Amino acid sequence: GLGASNIHLGDYIYLSIGTPTQNSKLIYNLAQNDNSIFGKIIKIEKKNFIESPFNFKIFSKGHRNPQGLTRIDDKIFSVEHGPKGGDELNLINQKNNYGWPLVSYGTRYMYDDNGKSYNKSHENKNFTEPLFALVPSVGISSVNVCPSVLIKYYNKKCLIALSLYGNNLRPGKSILIFLLNNDSNKIHSIEKIYLGDEMKL
Protein backbone atom coordinates (compact mmCIF):
# COMPACT_ATOMS: atom_id res chain seq x y z
CA GLY A 1 0.00 0.00 0.00
CA LEU A 2 0.90 3.66 -0.24
CA GLY A 3 0.72 4.32 3.49
CA ALA A 4 -1.23 7.21 5.02
CA SER A 5 -2.14 8.81 8.34
CA ASN A 6 -3.64 12.01 9.73
CA ILE A 7 -3.63 14.25 12.79
CA HIS A 8 -5.56 17.33 13.89
CA LEU A 9 -3.73 20.46 15.02
CA GLY A 10 -5.71 23.61 15.72
CA ASP A 11 -7.97 24.44 12.77
CA TYR A 12 -6.20 22.06 10.41
CA ILE A 13 -5.97 18.41 9.46
CA TYR A 14 -2.57 17.11 8.37
CA LEU A 15 -2.79 14.14 6.03
CA SER A 16 0.17 12.05 4.86
CA ILE A 17 0.00 10.31 1.48
CA GLY A 18 2.56 7.78 0.28
CA THR A 19 4.16 7.28 -3.11
CA PRO A 20 3.60 4.39 -5.55
CA THR A 21 6.87 2.44 -5.45
CA GLN A 22 6.86 0.61 -8.77
CA ASN A 23 9.89 1.79 -10.73
CA SER A 24 8.20 3.49 -13.65
CA LYS A 25 9.17 6.75 -15.32
CA LEU A 26 5.54 7.86 -15.02
CA ILE A 27 5.45 7.63 -11.21
CA TYR A 28 9.10 7.59 -10.12
CA ASN A 29 9.38 11.25 -9.13
CA LEU A 30 5.85 11.96 -7.85
CA ALA A 31 7.10 12.73 -4.33
CA GLN A 32 9.11 15.65 -5.78
CA ASN A 33 6.37 16.87 -8.12
CA ASP A 34 4.44 19.80 -6.66
CA ASN A 35 1.53 19.05 -9.00
CA SER A 36 1.01 15.64 -7.37
CA ILE A 37 -0.37 14.83 -3.90
CA PHE A 38 1.68 11.61 -3.71
CA GLY A 39 4.63 11.60 -1.33
CA LYS A 40 3.33 14.65 0.52
CA ILE A 41 1.91 15.76 3.84
CA ILE A 42 -0.92 18.11 3.05
CA LYS A 43 -2.59 20.72 5.28
CA ILE A 44 -6.38 21.04 5.12
CA GLU A 45 -8.44 23.76 6.79
CA LYS A 46 -11.33 22.08 8.64
CA LYS A 47 -13.97 24.77 8.34
CA ASN A 48 -13.80 25.02 4.55
CA PHE A 49 -13.26 21.35 3.77
CA ILE A 50 -16.88 20.47 2.89
CA GLU A 51 -17.27 23.42 0.54
CA SER A 52 -13.76 23.21 -0.91
CA PRO A 53 -12.33 19.69 -0.44
CA PHE A 54 -9.48 20.32 -2.87
CA ASN A 55 -8.38 23.55 -1.23
CA PHE A 56 -5.29 22.30 0.60
CA LYS A 57 -1.62 23.22 0.86
CA ILE A 58 1.44 21.01 0.53
CA PHE A 59 3.04 21.09 3.98
CA SER A 60 6.07 18.89 3.21
CA LYS A 61 7.21 16.57 0.41
CA GLY A 62 9.68 13.83 -0.44
CA HIS A 63 7.94 11.06 1.54
CA ARG A 64 7.97 7.40 0.46
CA ASN A 65 5.55 5.35 2.57
CA PRO A 66 4.38 7.21 5.70
CA GLN A 67 2.85 4.91 8.30
CA GLY A 68 1.96 7.24 11.14
CA LEU A 69 1.69 10.86 12.26
CA THR A 70 1.58 12.27 15.76
CA ARG A 71 2.44 15.51 17.53
CA ILE A 72 3.94 16.86 20.72
CA ASP A 73 2.64 20.38 21.30
CA ASP A 74 3.06 22.05 17.88
CA LYS A 75 5.73 19.64 16.60
CA ILE A 76 4.65 17.00 14.07
CA PHE A 77 6.38 13.63 13.77
CA SER A 78 6.09 11.01 11.05
CA VAL A 79 7.36 7.45 10.62
CA GLU A 80 7.74 5.88 7.20
CA HIS A 81 9.03 2.76 5.49
CA GLY A 82 12.24 2.95 3.52
CA PRO A 83 13.21 0.56 0.71
CA LYS A 84 15.05 -2.51 2.04
CA GLY A 85 16.08 -0.58 5.11
CA GLY A 86 16.15 3.10 5.91
CA ASP A 87 12.87 3.30 7.84
CA GLU A 88 12.62 6.85 9.20
CA LEU A 89 11.40 8.92 12.10
CA ASN A 90 11.02 12.50 10.85
CA LEU A 91 10.31 15.83 12.48
CA ILE A 92 8.01 17.48 9.95
CA ASN A 93 8.50 21.16 9.22
CA GLN A 94 6.58 23.25 6.73
CA LYS A 95 8.11 23.45 3.22
CA ASN A 96 10.81 20.90 4.06
CA ASN A 97 11.77 18.26 1.52
CA TYR A 98 12.63 14.81 2.91
CA GLY A 99 14.30 13.61 -0.25
CA TRP A 100 12.47 10.57 -1.62
CA PRO A 101 13.25 9.13 -4.18
CA LEU A 102 16.54 11.00 -4.60
CA VAL A 103 18.06 10.04 -1.23
CA SER A 104 17.45 7.21 1.23
CA TYR A 105 19.31 5.14 3.81
CA GLY A 106 17.71 2.07 2.24
CA THR A 107 18.72 0.09 -0.85
CA ARG A 108 17.08 -0.34 -4.23
CA TYR A 109 15.29 -3.62 -4.86
CA MET A 110 16.87 -5.92 -7.43
CA TYR A 111 14.25 -5.02 -10.06
CA ASP A 112 15.07 -1.39 -9.31
CA ASP A 113 18.47 -0.68 -10.90
CA ASN A 114 20.15 -3.90 -9.71
CA GLY A 115 19.95 -3.23 -5.97
CA LYS A 116 22.32 -0.26 -5.92
CA SER A 117 22.39 2.03 -2.91
CA TYR A 118 20.74 5.45 -2.97
CA ASN A 119 22.56 8.65 -2.17
CA LYS A 120 22.48 8.45 1.62
CA SER A 121 23.35 11.92 2.89
CA HIS A 122 20.20 14.04 2.77
CA GLU A 123 22.00 17.17 3.93
CA ASN A 124 24.58 17.04 1.14
CA LYS A 125 21.74 17.07 -1.40
CA ASN A 126 19.88 19.90 0.42
CA PHE A 127 17.18 17.62 1.85
CA THR A 128 16.08 17.23 5.47
CA GLU A 129 17.78 14.42 7.37
CA PRO A 130 15.55 12.05 9.36
CA LEU A 131 15.67 12.37 13.13
CA PHE A 132 16.60 8.70 13.03
CA ALA A 133 17.03 6.13 10.28
CA LEU A 134 16.61 2.43 11.08
CA VAL A 135 19.06 0.24 9.16
CA PRO A 136 18.31 -2.58 8.66
CA SER A 137 14.57 -2.01 8.45
CA VAL A 138 12.28 -2.91 11.35
CA GLY A 139 9.03 -2.43 9.40
CA ILE A 140 8.05 0.59 11.48
CA SER A 141 4.30 1.12 11.74
CA SER A 142 2.10 3.48 13.77
CA VAL A 143 3.57 6.13 16.08
CA ASN A 144 2.09 7.96 19.03
CA VAL A 145 3.04 10.05 22.02
CA CYS A 146 4.04 7.89 24.97
CA PRO A 147 1.37 7.51 27.65
CA SER A 148 1.92 9.48 30.85
CA VAL A 149 3.17 6.43 32.76
CA LEU A 150 6.12 6.08 30.34
CA ILE A 151 6.85 9.81 30.30
CA LYS A 152 7.01 9.69 34.10
CA TYR A 153 9.16 6.54 34.05
CA TYR A 154 11.72 7.93 31.59
CA ASN A 155 11.40 11.51 32.82
CA LYS A 156 11.49 12.62 29.18
CA LYS A 157 9.14 13.36 26.34
CA CYS A 158 8.94 10.28 24.18
CA LEU A 159 7.30 8.64 21.17
CA ILE A 160 6.21 5.02 20.94
CA ALA A 161 6.12 3.07 17.67
CA LEU A 162 5.35 -0.48 16.61
CA SER A 163 7.59 -2.52 14.36
CA LEU A 164 6.79 -5.68 12.42
CA TYR A 165 10.13 -7.27 13.24
CA GLY A 166 13.04 -6.69 15.54
CA ASN A 167 15.68 -7.70 13.00
CA ASN A 168 18.84 -9.73 13.05
CA LEU A 169 17.11 -11.21 10.05
CA ARG A 170 13.67 -10.20 11.25
CA PRO A 171 12.63 -12.40 14.19
CA GLY A 172 9.69 -11.12 16.21
CA LYS A 173 7.75 -7.91 16.65
CA SER A 174 8.84 -5.09 18.91
CA ILE A 175 7.93 -1.72 20.38
CA LEU A 176 10.33 1.19 19.88
CA ILE A 177 10.49 4.06 22.35
CA PHE A 178 12.20 7.20 21.08
CA LEU A 179 13.35 9.41 23.97
CA LEU A 180 13.58 13.07 22.95
CA ASN A 181 15.66 15.99 24.15
CA ASN A 182 14.03 18.88 26.00
CA ASP A 183 13.25 20.75 22.77
CA SER A 184 11.71 17.64 21.13
CA ASN A 185 13.90 18.12 18.06
CA LYS A 186 16.57 15.42 18.57
CA ILE A 187 16.69 11.79 19.67
CA HIS A 188 18.30 11.33 23.08
CA SER A 189 18.17 7.52 23.02
CA ILE A 190 16.04 4.59 21.87
CA GLU A 191 14.71 1.60 23.76
CA LYS A 192 13.40 -1.54 22.05
CA ILE A 193 10.95 -3.89 23.79
CA TYR A 194 10.84 -7.30 22.15
CA LEU A 195 7.34 -8.80 21.83
CA GLY A 196 8.10 -12.06 20.05
CA ASP A 197 6.29 -13.67 17.15
CA GLU A 198 2.90 -13.80 18.87
CA MET A 199 1.47 -10.52 20.12
CA LYS A 200 -1.59 -10.69 22.37
CA LEU A 201 -3.39 -7.60 23.61
Model regions: which residues?
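A conserved catalytic-loop motif detector
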Residues: 14-17
